[in-house]
């Protein structure tokens, strides 16, 4: 996973998503740090399901994994 600041996106590999850590740029509901807990693939190795869990509240959310590429919404790692 590499950052490509010039394009405003982060390069994210679907195969590296599980257990990866993310920081939400705009905190809501006291949820800032997240971890990817579920990633499912179809027979063509395309992501069919991605679930992210808030570290503090343990709330889980289904997410389109492509949203993690947007640097104005997500940062890779816990910051």
Question: Predicted segments — roles?
Answer:
Residues 34, 46-51:
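Short aromatic-glycine-enriched beta-strand elements
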Residues 1-18:
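Mixed-charge, Lys/Arg-rich low-complexity intrinsically disordered regions
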Residues 39, 53-55:
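Generic beta-structure capping elements
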Residues 24-35:
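Short coil-to-beta-strand transition motifs
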Residues 39-46:
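Short, conserved beta-turn/loop elements at beta-strand boundaries and strand-helix junctions
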Residues 19, 25, 48, 55-59, ...:
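Basic nucleic-acid-binding interfaces
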Residues 56-79:
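Intrinsically disordered, low-complexity, charged/polar segments
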């Amino acid at each position: 996973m590499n950052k490509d600041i010039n394009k405003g996106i982060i390069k994210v590999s679907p195969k590296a998503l599980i257990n990866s850590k993310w920081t939400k740029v705009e905190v809501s509901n006291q949820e800032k740090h997240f971890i990817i807990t579920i990633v499912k693939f179809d027979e063509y190795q395309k992501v069919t399901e991605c679930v992210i869990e808030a570290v503090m509240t343990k709330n889980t959310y289904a997410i389109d994994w492509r949203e993690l590429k947007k640097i104005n919404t997500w940062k890779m790692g816990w910051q």
